[in-house]
Amino acid sequence: MTCIFLFLSLLLHSADPGKENVLPESDALQDPPSHKVWDQLLKKYVSPDGWVDYRGFDEDREALISYLEILGDHSPTALWGRETVLAYYINLYNAATVLLILEHYPLESIRDIPRPWGKKRIQIGDQRYSLGEIEHEILRKMGDPRIHFAINCASLSCPKLLAQAYAEETLESQLEEVARGFINDPSRNDFSGEKPRLSRIFKWYRKDFTTRKTSLIDFLNRYLPVPLPAKAQVSYLPYNWALNKKRH
């Protein structure tokens, strides 16, 4: 994991002109990969409401594998912008999750797969990573809690898989869209009663949504049409791990 922390440190300091780029020149000149293939696959096999046609996806498995190989050959460098890096890792996580499901399909839940988030299955450069490492050691450390609404764990209670690839130039609007959509989805969060019932994502990753000056309620109120009281007491809904597959 040493290279992950080195890369993140370089990324966080890349805006400082006084910092020297210590990456090898060949890596520093590497351009970000295109996400066009992934975008086309998503538009073809994911419905607007997030249902995934895994049977159809499997017909294009080779295209998905090729896309992941391209990402693996284009590991991020300190010269990439923050939005470029975020889009890269979100797309990588989601594409790798779809491939993981295809490799074990048919199944009823991602949790039917041994160590779905713990096994190192993802090649980036000369190292292998697990889905858990991509999420916890890279994406979460980049400090944007909205990634929790962008990465998809192939389950009904997860944020839906967006039917388009994330891209540097549209990332901000995409993250705002998925955050607002997830928070206001009554199947994932229930604000109908006196006591809000939230997705367990807000329980598991509560510290990602809070700062010294802002609470979880403050974060939620950014996206709710009717703000919650500052001292609202919340509870959490059960998490449905059933596969987010399209019903044929």
Regions found by a protein language model. Give the residues of each.
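Sec-dependent N-terminal signal peptides of Gram-negative exported proteins
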Residues: 2-15
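Interaction/scaffold regions that mediate signaling and macromolecular assembly across diverse proteins
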Residues: 16-248
